[in-house]
Amino acid sequence: MTVAPGETRRRADVVVIVGELPRIHHSLVGELAGTVPDLSTVNQRAFFVVGPNGMSVPPLNGGREATRLSCGQASLAATLAALRTQYKGRRTSQPVSNFNDFAKALAAARFPVFLFSGHAAEGLALEMLQGLIADLNRNSRASGLHLPANENGWGSTLASAWMTGFPLRTGFARGFPEFDPWRCDVARMIAAGEADLHLRISAATAQPKEKKRRMALIALTKTQEPVAGAAVTIAIGEAGLDHDAVVYSSRTGSLRSTEAQAASQLPSAATIIRLIASHAFAEPLPC
């Protein structure tokens, strides 16, 4: 039920924007509005947007506007639930605006695609969206295209998934990977005093919040000055800028290699972590 960005550009004849999308993806929406899919029977894509009234919508080329699907000021999750309910022919406490236009477009569609991001959609909204797409696939075809708010963050999630079988917030305290998004929430662990050492890795320098008692901070970041409050600061390079890297690309929906734009002598985060691990553990780390 997922689709690649390239397939969306080529085939999507109905595009449904679910919630607010990060600004880095607004150009994709404009590109979709300015091109014609090869499966369209009317030589034009139909655009809908799901969300409360007043929600910002990426601009479409040619002065076009997306048809709003909303339940007034109801939340995104509630609107998706109502949309799913109406699609099944059941009654709702508040109908979705322009639902008949949406139903007609889906009936004629050959390749509808829902654009979404975890940036503005919480868990229940994403669950309702997946349910709606599953319902549509029982009789026709529909797909979802995930547009991450942060490409580096999503790349890290994919790397965690292929190495452990789970996304981030996975722990190894018992010798094997355990996915627990609540227990392994770093911010919660620090606030609760469960941690006595915080290793922070970030290309952007950020001042830490109020220092917690008994917790030391080791900061790996691109900086020329020590990070305030850190016991140790180690300068690292930025992937794709200071050194060659493999990064996630939303445009292709996959990983790609990139050369350093301004190569420097700053080491990569992976190099520093491996050096730390070589002194902290008797056995070498896996690749």
Model segments located where?
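Non-catalytic alpha/beta scaffold blocks inside enzyme catalytic domains
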Residues: 1-141, 171-287
